[in-house]
Amino acid sequence: MSDILDKIIAVKREEIAAALKSAPLEELKLQASARDSRDFVGALRGKHAAGHAAVIAEVKKASPSKGVLRERFVPADIARSYAEHGAACLSVLTDEQFFQGSARYLEEARAACNLPVLRKDFIVDPYQVLEARAMGADAILLIAAALDTPLMVDLEAYAHSLGLAVLVEVHNRDELSAALELKTPLVGINNRNLRTFETTIDTTLGMLDAIPDDRIVVTESGILSRADVERMEAAGVHTFLVGEAFMRAENPGAELARMFF
């Protein structure tokens, strides 16, 4: 398979250039300043303190590798279902071209519940960080495979200055070394290789020994069953970002409860 990540990043740069014309920085800053903030990291730690898994439940219509995951896609209903069944936070895809996401989906999901929300997108520029705050996000994703370390550090600092939490995502030990330069406690291990889209949960299990105890490990992608959850919890991983398994279920929140609680 060709390198999907490079294609996505190229599209992101085109989108940013167009967005700067339609929504200038000063306009975005006004929108961002009007947004309230929810404690993303605190919500995860609250679940841990209560002895529960902390689930970041994803609102995702489609993916490049799997196509459309959910035909009847109503973000507000999905968000409410997750909140009612024990999710700690939400993750909402805002990438339009590859994941059929939307900023509007994030706004609708956040308005439907009280959970903190992660903007799930491919962030490569400070403009997108401000854009995330303006659309109501409480956290952003920084993907180590898409960013060099100095830029990742700068994007994190800007995010924190806006009151946004940061989840830094890695897939291998080289990316992990770069990610540990950041201040965020949230280290996501993506079990899916973003350059090939191949997935194995052994990716998370094979990297745990290199992560300091003061970081919160978030296992991402490929968590599809109760057995996968139990395997992670046995290894000391208690924070999960899950989308596909929930999106394919008739009732996403009920599937969350079945897998985790």
UniProtKB/Swiss-Prot annotation:
Alphabetized InterPro entries for the sequence: Aldolase_TIM, Indole-3-glycerol_P_synth, Indole-3-glycerol_P_synth_dom, Indole-3-GlycerolPSynthase_CS, RibuloseP-bd_barrel
GO MF annotation list: indole-3-glycerol-phosphate synthase activity; phosphoribosylanthranilate isomerase activity
Enzyme class, UniProt record, top EC level: lyase
Domain of life: Bacteria
Keywords, ordered alphabetically: Amino-acid biosynthesis, Aromatic amino acid biosynthesis, Decarboxylase, Lyase, Tryptophan biosynthesis
EC number in record: 4.1.1.48
Catalytic activity: 1-(2-carboxyphenylamino)-1-deoxy-D-ribulose 5-phosphate + H(+) = (1S,2R)-1-C-(indol-3-yl)glycerol 3-phosphate + CO2 + H2O
Keyword flag Lyase: yes
PROSITE patterns hit by this protein: IGPS (PS00614)
Family from the record: Belongs to the TrpC family.
Xref: HAMAP family: IGPS_B (MF_00134_B)
Record's protein name: Indole-3-glycerol phosphate synthase
Gene name of this polypeptide: trpC
